[in-house]
A protein has these predicted regions:
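Tryptophan-anchored aromatic micro-motifs
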Residues: 32-53
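Extracytoplasmic/periplasmic/luminal assembly and interaction segments
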Residues: 47-99
């Protein structure tokens, strides 16, 4: 009788120890979601034919500062039939939520145009339409592919690979 009680106590302590170690392992190996900062350089060719050339060469800096706010910096140049212009804008994000395991959705509160930006809004809006869900929301898939490397996907396709910093 005493022996079976001792064995039961040993099994209970072993099970408690295993659950404790599993919990500690789980908590220490979870990815830290916020803040999320990731940058990359991308080239977008949105030309529909040779007569209507629209290309962007931009550095993108995506920052989810907190669960409910962040921004996307777009710096570079836009090339159209009218020539080459400078693109320097910040897309401010609010009311964010993690809507699935790897998908974030934010409301676009405003697009801030720098004094150095010379790209017409009609050209910029074509790029914005390529990377956003609609003119008022940004929805991105953030898939980890390496220790600090992520692939960022938009509503239509993957957009770019970036390095988290």
């Amino acid at each position: 009788m005493k022996r079976s009680i001792g064995i039961n106590i040993i099994f209970m302590l072993a099970a408690l120890l295993m659950v404790t170690f599993a919990g500690v392992y789980y908590l220490t190996h979870q990815a830290k979601d916020f803040p999320f900062r990731c940058s990359a350089f991308s080239r977008y060719d949105l030309s529909r034919n040779d007569d209507k050339r629209i290309e962007f060469a931009v550095a993108q800096d995506l920052r989810f500062d907190q669960k409910d706010s962040g921004y996307l910096l777009l710096n570079g140049q836009a090339t159209s039939n009218d020539g080459v212009t400078i693109l320097n804008r910040r897309v401010a994000l609010i009311n964010g939520a993690k809507i699935s395991d790897d998908t974030y959705q934010y409301q676009i509160s405003k697009v801030v145009t720098s004094n150095t930006d010379t790209t017409p809004d009609v050209i910029f809006n074509k790029l914005l339409a390529e990377i956003t869900l609609d003119p008022t929301h940004l929805q991105l898939d953030v898939d980890k592919i390496d220790k600090n490397t992520y692939i960022i996907g938009g509503p239509i396709s993957y957009l770019y690979t970036c390095q988290r910093y």
